[in-house]
Amino acid sequence: ASHANLAIDQISEQNFQPRIHVVKGFSISTAVVCHQCEDAPCANVCPNGAIIHNKDYYYVDQDKCIGCKTCVLACPYGTMEVVSRPVMRKLTALNTIEAFKAEANKCDLCHHRAEGPACVEVCPTQALVCIDRDALEDMVKERRRKAAFETGADLLF
């Protein structure tokens, strides 16, 4: 098993629906996960308002989700999916049956875990990290600055 799949397997063992997908290429594999978009298309198109923004992350309120897949179509990164989960449906006061409910599934940065995202914690190669937007913007600025100085003499206008 690849290292990325190992991380997914470890998370799944905790009865957890993986919210990270591995895209395999010929020589490399990469993890694809929700980008927590600033103006999240998935949240904007949800007819029930089930995708909610809370501080630094978006999550799905499963009580509101109807499993319509509109969010799946809207996600520009292909990271939204609809999964079926077993639920108990009450037929009468005395009778219940097991049924399945379709619901949206997306990364919510494991907001319920004090340790942060489970995938980051269990990744055997430490290839997964979480950084906030400000830190990402700072990294981009620094890389651009370095690139400008490294090629500075070569640029003539």
Swiss-Prot record:
Q: Which residues form the 4Fe-4S ferredoxin-type domain?
A: 24-55, 56-85, 100-133
A Pfam family cross-referenced in the UniProt record is Fer4
Instruction: Give the residues the record marks as binding [4Fe-4S] cluster 3.
Output: 34, 37, 42, 75
What CDD domains has UniProt attached to this entry?
Answer: HycB_like (cd10554)
Q: Where does [4Fe-4S] cluster 4 bind?
A: 46, 65, 68, 71
**Which parts of the sequence bind [4Fe-4S] cluster 2?**
107, 110, 119
Q: Where are the transmembrane segments?
A: none
Keywords from the named record: 4Fe-4S, Iron, Iron-sulfur, Metal-binding, Repeat
Q: What's a single GO MF annotation on this record?
A: 4 iron, 4 sulfur cluster binding
Q: Which SUPFAM superfamilies match?
A: 4Fe-4S ferredoxins
PANTHER family from the entry? ELECTRON TRANSPORT PROTEIN HYDN-RELATED, OXIDOREDUCTASE
> What protein is this chain from?
Frd operon probable iron-sulfur subunit A
